[in-house]
């Protein structure tokens, strides 16, 4: 096999083996008896071969040093390539994220363009917008959830039914047959009862009848007339109707003022 097809390591090992063989022949010829020594011509050829192998060894060692430097440069280049690969992968991930963001933005932009085109095809006058805004303000609705759509019953404020179902809406009704009263009024009743007891039966301060007014589950207010007289129903509808009329009048005035301002 030609030496050019061998690696540098194999060539070095082959040269060292040749030098070892030549050196062994020279040493054996030196210590051999005179009758067994080789001729001077053969000895000279072995010496020339040894010198040639030595030069070849030095050249191969120089080549190995050059190859070691090249290998070092290759390692440095591999490290740079690895770092560049990491940067490329990071940039690729960022490009993927940017592509996704751009795709989302384009989709949303197309939706907005479609909405604009639809709005341009069916324009709405300012008077209609003012009327619709007035309807919203008349119902005390100032905003709606972000996900609100046509037909959604949700409002940003509690309705009358929700307020009546709450604890505050039931504070003036009977619960389990007992009236809910303010703690201060209960304390005053106890103090009045104790004062009457201290003054005696002939005192000037009349005894206040507890539970004189009571709400029935039907919503009517009843006043107790005594132990044997029973109770009398009080009509509060007139006051409620008057309050409702006042509210309607105020709402009508505010509506007319809003319409005049908008015009």
Curated annotation (Swiss-Prot):
A single GO BP: regulation of transcription by RNA polymerase II
Statement: the UniProt record of this protein carries the keyword Methyltransferase: no
Positions with biased composition (Low complexity): 251-263
Cell compartment(s), UniProt: Nucleus
**Primary location:** nucleus
Q: Which family does it belong to?
A: Belongs to the Mediator complex subunit 4 family.
The top of its lineage is: Eukaryota, Metazoa, Ecdysozoa, Arthropoda, Hexapoda
The protein in question is named Mediator of RNA polymerase II transcription subunit 4
Please name the GO terms that the record assigns under molecular function. transcription coregulator activity
Sorted UniProt keywords = Activator, Coiled coil, Nucleus, Transcription, Transcription regulation
Q: Where is this region: Disordered?
A: 209-228, 235-263
The parts of the chain that form a coiled coil are 61-111
Keyword Nucleus (UniProt): yes
């Amino acid at each position: 096999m030609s030496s050019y097809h061998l690696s540098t390591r194999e060539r070095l090992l082959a040269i060292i083996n040749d030098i070892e063989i030549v050196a062994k022949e020279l040493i054996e010829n030196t210590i051999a008896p005179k009758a067994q020594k080789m001729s001077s011509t053969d000895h000279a050829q072995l010496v020339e071969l040894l010198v040639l192998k030595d030069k070849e060894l030095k050249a191969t060692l120089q080549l190995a040093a050059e190859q070691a430097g090249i290998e070092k440069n290759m390692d440095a280049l591999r490290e740079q390539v690895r770092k560049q690969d990491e940067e490329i992968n990071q940039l690729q991930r960022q490009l993927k994220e940017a592509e996704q963001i751009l795709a989302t933005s384009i989709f949303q932009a197309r939706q907005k363009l479609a909405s604009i085109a639809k709005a341009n095809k069916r324009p709405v006058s300012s008077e209609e917008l003012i009327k619709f805004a007035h309807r919203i303000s008349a119902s005390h609705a100032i905003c709606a959830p972000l996900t609100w759509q046509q037909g959604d019953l949700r409002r940003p404020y509690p309705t009358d039914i929700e307020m009546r179902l709450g604890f505050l809406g039931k504070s003036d009704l009977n619960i389990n047959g007992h009236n809910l009263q303010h703690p201060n009024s209960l304390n005053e009743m106890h103090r009045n009862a104790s004062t009457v007891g201290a003054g005696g039966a002939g005192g000037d301060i009349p005894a206040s009848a507890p539970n004189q007014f009571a709400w029935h589950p039907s919503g009517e207010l009843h006043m107790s007339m005594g132990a044997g007289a029973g109770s009398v129903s009080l009509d509060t509808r007139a006051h409620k109707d008057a309050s409702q009329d006042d509210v309607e009048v105020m709402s009508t005035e505010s509506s007319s003022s809003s319409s005049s301002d908008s015009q």
